[in-house]
């Protein structure tokens, strides 16, 4: 089954600083061995002005779980994760996700 690693970034202390470093985060993600596609998405703000449940999502797509599991042992993945935690002043969650085609 296709697998993706999803990074869910909580609301950062400084959105401007996060955005300034996000391009580098994407470059690091694309360098991870076995990554087929990288998708970045920004969470829409709530209409009432209250904080959104998250700030950004970054998806790294792989052919299957084994490819994703192997990829996370690479130096490139270490660099990506290091940058993720550096940027994520509000926190970040990293998930392995089984993609279900519907």
Segment roles from a protein language model:
Residues 1-102:
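Macromolecular interaction modules
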